[in-house]
Amino acid sequence: ELKRHLLDQHSHLYCPLADGLSYLPNGIELVGASTQPLWHASLWVADDLLIMQKLDGQYCLTAASLCSPSSWHLAQKIGHSMARIHDPVPSLHQKLTPKIDRFFDHLMVEKPIQRFNWSLQANTNLAQFPEDKIIHPASTALYYRCERQTLTRLPQTNAIAFTIRVYVYPMMSLTQVPDALTQLKAAIDAMPKAVASYKEIIYFAPALQKYFSD
């Protein structure tokens, strides 16, 4: 399915190989073993690929190819339920996890869902890990991290494919987007303290003032 989609919709970028695809801009051959289909597919797209399946009444993360985590380790999440995975997120486990499971139950094959998430970081690295956390001085340059996430029900297995594509922008670039900094400040000001702490807003606050005061 993915191979056919890339060849149909992005034929200017890909051409077929017997066991994979060739990426035309640089000639790289993207091949993989048929016994590892998720790894095979992950070579073809920039998105991280995660698979969730319903086990014993709960959706669990059962497989993944992850290159750009947002302050978490795959080894600590794989095999666990959504409730366990989201436990560190303030208010989410208690209030939203049951709703997330119900939402997944109603996800239809022909209607994939797209959503976006954001955070701040102190460098351009796509991969962010919990141990990278530091207190950021006011002079530190900031970057806006945006995740484009999709959820798709797979027709044959009924599992859910969760994709994450990460983009990182210098905070200064938001000045070119009308009202972007104003809306970001409003979102931060309205954020519960626990969520602001989880997103490390407290550490970025001195540096943020430079952008919000201009």
Annotate each PLM feature:
Residues 1-214:
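Extended, well-ordered protein cores
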